[in-house]
C-alpha cells in the first residue's frame, strides 16, 4: 500500500473510553506545524488528528473494526460530511483523504483567500468548516466562535444558537471524492505534455478557479464544473475527461498488521520480529514475504500477521502516459467558458446596392466582402459566393425582359445577414435581340424586316448548291466504281475463256477416241457437231441526271392559352342589400377552383351581382413555388463524443473478490466512477479478466478484474434537431388580395388550407414531384447557431450505423445530457478493446457537424437547389435546376365574403399604347393600356386566347397587364369592360420568342405550373411562319411561293451574270492571243 517513510515518528496515544472501543488520538510528527494557518476556532483540528483503518498507525486499530471515527475533528470522522454523498473513496479502508495527507505532510490545506470561490451545491447553513480541492491546491473555509456560515456559503453571520435548520455542533464538509498517496515525481516536460492534452480535451474552458487554462477572447461568469483530475505535484492539477486507472499492490512490511487473537495488537518489538525473523503465523501473502512458523502453540501466545485489505495504489493512464499521482479524484471547481460574440442576424446592409448589367446584376458591398448571396429576378434565381466587395451574378440567358423586381438575400464575411429589394430594366421585345444571323435571328424573324428575306434567299441558294454538289459527288462515285470494277470483269472473262478452251479440247479428244474405235471395228461414221457461239453483251452507258427538288413541310400546329387565369364565381348563395351612396352591399358563400399560375402572375376570381354593372376580383398572386419537406416525427441528436474508462483491481481487492462479480451488469458502476459520471447517462458497463500476479502488480496470481464502461456525452452542449422528410411537396408563397383591397401573404403547403382571412381560406393543391434520392433526406438544424443542412438520416426509432440519427433523443434537454430514459442508441457505436490491464475504445459515431458542414444550406442535391426559407412551413425550400413542371390549382373557400358594388355604370374609354414582350413564354406579353374612367372600378379585357382583370382608378391612368399569345405578330380586337361600359381596343405589336433558358453556374429556376400553357414552349413551324409571313394559311402559301420565285429569279440572275463574265474573260484572252 502506501510507502510512508515517517512511520517511526508516529506515536499512538490510546485513550480508553468504554473499553477497547475508545478512540485513539495519534500525534503527528513533532517537527510538523500542520494546521497552524487555520485556528481551531475555525473548525480545524489542532496538531493532532484521529485516523481510522490506516496501515501506518497501529495494528491495534485493525482489531477494533467497530471504531467509526473520521479524520478532522475531536469528535472523530463521524463529524465529517462528504459532498456528493455517494463519494466512494471516503468509505474505503487504506486510502488517504486530503485531511490525512495534510496531517502526514504530503500536501498542505491552506486557509481560503478572499478570491477563492465556494462552489455551489451542498447546503452550508450552520457552523461548518469545509474544504475542497482547487485547481492549484486545497483550501478551507470556516467561521469564528458565535458565527455560522450562511446558506449560500459566502459569508459568516451571527449565530443565535437556536436558529432552526442549523447543523448541530462543529462539522467538516469535504467537497469532492479524492484519494491521496505517495507519488512518483514526473519531469516538467511530462507535465507540459499532460497539460497540453488536457487543454485539447477542454478547449472551451478559459479559467479554472481564477487560473488561466486557455486563452479566450471572451469568457462567461464562473460556474460549477465537475471534473476528474490528478495532482502530479506541479503548479496545478491536470483535469481529465477520458482516462483509465489501475490499482497496483506492492508487497512491503508496512502492508501487514500483526495482532494476538483475543488480546490485541502486538507490541512494536513483536511486530518487528514477526516481519524479520518469520517467527509468527500469518496468511498466505505474509508467509510468502516474511516466512511463517507452523508450530502447534496456542494462538493467543503468538502474533498473527495478515495483509491489509486495500485497493492498492492508483496509476492513471492519460494521454498515452502512465502517472502515479499525489492525489486522484473527482470534484467540483469553478470555471469560466469561452463566449463567442453572437453573429449578427438578418438586418440592413449598409453600403449595399445593385447595378444592372447585361443578363444579371452586380452586387456591391462596401462594408465587407460577400460570403454568399441569392438573387431572384421574377422566378429565376442565381446564387454566388465570391469573397469580394463587387460580385456579378448572372441569370439564365434571355430570361429577363422589361422591368423586373430583384430580391437579394445574402451574408457578409463579417457575419451580417441582409435582405433588400431593387429593380432593373432589361431590354424588352425586339430590343432584346441584338445579333445578326444567330439563333435569336432565326427564332424572331419579325424583328428583322429586311435581313430576314436576304437570309432566306441565301439559305435557299446554299441548299440548291449543296444538292448540286451532292449529286455530282454521287456521279463521281459511280464513275470511280466503274474503273474499279472493269479489271475484275476482264479477269473473270479471261478465266471463262480459258475454261471454254479446255472444255473444247477435252471434247475433241473424246471424239477422236470414238472415231479410232469405230475405225477399228470397221464401222464408218461421221460425227458433226455444231459450234455454239456465245457472245457477251456489252454494258450500255448509263447517263446520270440531276434532280434538285425543294420541299417545305408543316409538321405541327402549336396551341397556346392564357397565363393569368380568371374564373367567374358561380355562387347561388348571394344576398344583397341597398347601401349608402349608390352602393350595393352583398354577402356571398361558395367554393371555386382556380388554376394555379406561375410565379409573378395572378389568378382571379371574378364576382358580379345581378342588377349591378360593377364587379370585383379576389386575386391570388403567386410569388414563389418551391418544394418543402413534409416532415414525419422529429427527434434531437446530440453532438456526441464516445468515452470509455476502465479500472483494474487485483483479485481479492475491492469489488474483485473472486473474479468479476455476477451483479456487475451493463448498468453497474465501479466505486472508482462514483460521482464521476451521470448514472442516468447513456452507456454500457462490463467486467473482464485481466492479468494477475507480481508482473501485473498483484499479490494474487489469479486474473484481476478490469471494470470498464463506455458511454457517450455531449461536452459542448450542441444539439441538432433532425426532421426526416416523408415527402417533398409543392409549397407556394401567395399574396391574397381581397375585393376590398386588403392584402395578406400566406405560405400554403400542398393540401394544407391557410388560416381564414375575412371569410376566405385558400388550399394549394400541387402534385408531388418524382425526384429520386429525396425521401432519405432530413432537415438538420443546430439549435444554437441555427445552422441548417440537408442530409440522409435515420427515421425516428431506427439507428442504422452510418447515418445521422444513430443516437436519438426525445427532447432538447435529454439530448443535452444524453439521458438513457430519453435517448436510444446502438451500443456498438462505441467499440471497446481490452488490453493487458486496461481497455481502450473507438468510435463509429457519425459526426453530425461534419455531415452538416458538407451539406450545409445552400446546397445542390439531386438536381435541386436547396436554400433557407423563413416561413412557418419549413426551414428549407428546394427549386429544380431545370425547367420542371407540376400540376396544381387553388381551392378557394369563401364564407360570408363581403362585396361593395356600385350601381352606377362607369364611363370608361381607352386605347392600347404598346404591346411588347414574348410569346409562348412564362411571363407573357406586356400590354400597356391607357384608360379614362369616371370612377374607381374593375376593368376586364378579353382577347381570343386570354383574358385578364385589373383595378381602375378614377381619371386618366396607364396600366400594364399581362396577356399570353401564341404568335409573334399580334393584330387583333379585344373586348374591354370597364365598370359596366363595353368597348373594343386594338392590340398591335411584334413579340419575340425567348428560348428555353440556358443555365449559368449557380443559377436555377423556381417551379412553374404545367396547367399554365405559357411555360417555356418551344415554337412550332406555325409560330415561325406567322413571324415570317403573318397570320393565315393564304399568307403562308403566298409567302412560300414568293420565296421560291425570288430564289429562282436570283439564281437565274446569278447564272446569267456568271456566264456573261465567263464570255467576257474568254474574249479578252482571245484578243490578247
Curated annotation (Swiss-Prot):
Which Cys residues form disulphide pairs? 26-49, 143-156, 180-327, 206-216, 258-305, 287-292, 349-352, 356-424, 376-381, 563-604, 576-586, 629-725, 644-841, 650-698, 656-705, 660-687, 691-696, 778-793, 809-823, 908-978, 918-921, 943-974
Per the UniProt annotation, where are the glycans attached?
Answer: 33, 63, 853, 914, 936
Enumerate the transmembrane spans. Answer: 454-474, 1037-1057
| InterPro entries assigned | Phlebo_G2_C (IPR043603), Phlebovirus_G1 (IPR010826), Phlebovirus_G2_fusion (IPR009878)
The record's annotation in Pfam families points to:
Phlebo_G2_C (PF19019), Phlebovirus_G1 (PF07243), Phlebovirus_G2 (PF07245)
GO CC annotation, single: membrane
**What are the BP-aspect GO terms?**
entry receptor-mediated virion attachment to host cell; fusion of virus membrane with host endosome membrane; symbiont entry into host cell
Segments carrying the region annotation (Golgi retention signal) are 475-521
Entry protein name? Envelopment polyprotein
Native species: SFTS phlebovirus (isolate SFTSV/Human/China/HB29/2010)
